[in-house]
Amino acid sequence: METKEIIYASPKRERIDKFLQNELSDLSRTNIQNLISEGYIKVDGNTVKTNYKLKESNVITIDYKEPEELDVVKQDIPVDIVYEDNDLLIVNKPKGMVVHPSAGHKDGTLVNALLYHCELSSINGTIRPGIVHRIDKDTSGLLIVAKNDKAHVKLSEMIANKEVKRKYYALVHGSIKHDYGTIDAPIARNPKERKEMAVIDEGKPSITHFKVIDRFEKYTLIECELETGRTHQIRVHMKYINHPLVGDPVYGPRKTLNTNGQSLHSKSIEFNHPITGEHLYFETEIPSYMVDTMVKLDK
């Protein structure tokens, strides 16, 4: 169990759960309240209530619980494997499939399916074996998966060094006037809603390039290329320029087309093989759910 101490230095009294929400960016307010209620967060060595108001010089002690280990079951679920060798796989993930197990999704995930198919790297533990980078449940498309630790380490370094090119198809609201564009706006967790990301001055540098593929009366199909890989980056950036993704339940408008989640597809991945150095490029077609939506827009 990991322990962390924070000294409250402000003369102004503040609720402990609200204060820690800003201090612990990796935890939601609900997570923090649960830790307080269960006695994992104490003030001056004493348990407190979630509405306790901190005083200047209070010492807050946080004992982080070890993450729950889930027994990940191997499941015979069909997977679209675009490429495979001894070190990695390229998978075309369908829309609606969760990438790895969690408390709310213990089975039926991509990891459950892949473990039935082959061995995966162990660097990310039993919950996320082989997962080098993630895409959201309702985002479809290409994903790199590592089959051994050596490949996993190298692939992670390559992504951090911007040596992996990733492009996406996105169907957005509104008609984008310019054929090309770059969105350079920092992204961080939304202080008002911890489950969401937002463009914030103090955020991490985030850059998305886009070009228009097709225009409709009230919508635009674009290709996006990530220069950085922040959580929800394309979704947040497109909302920032007032062209949110069609169907996006978090960042989109209340009135949107029913596409069962954001219209976003990982269309291509390009990189050099982490072990052999061979240049690799993989590309998929626009998925049927996006094609069906665009056919309706043409009518």
Regions found by a protein language model. Give the residues of each.
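Conserved hydrophobic positions within beta-strands
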Residues: 81, 172, 209-212, 245
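Active-site flanking residues adjacent to catalytic metal/cofactor-binding acidic residues
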Residues: 91, 236, 247
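The conserved catalytic core of RNA pseudouridine synthases
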Residues: 125-156, 165, 169, 185-241, ...
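Short, surface-exposed loop/helix-turn segments at secondary-structure junctions
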Residues: 198, 246-256
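Active-site-adjacent capping/gating segments
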Residues: 258-266
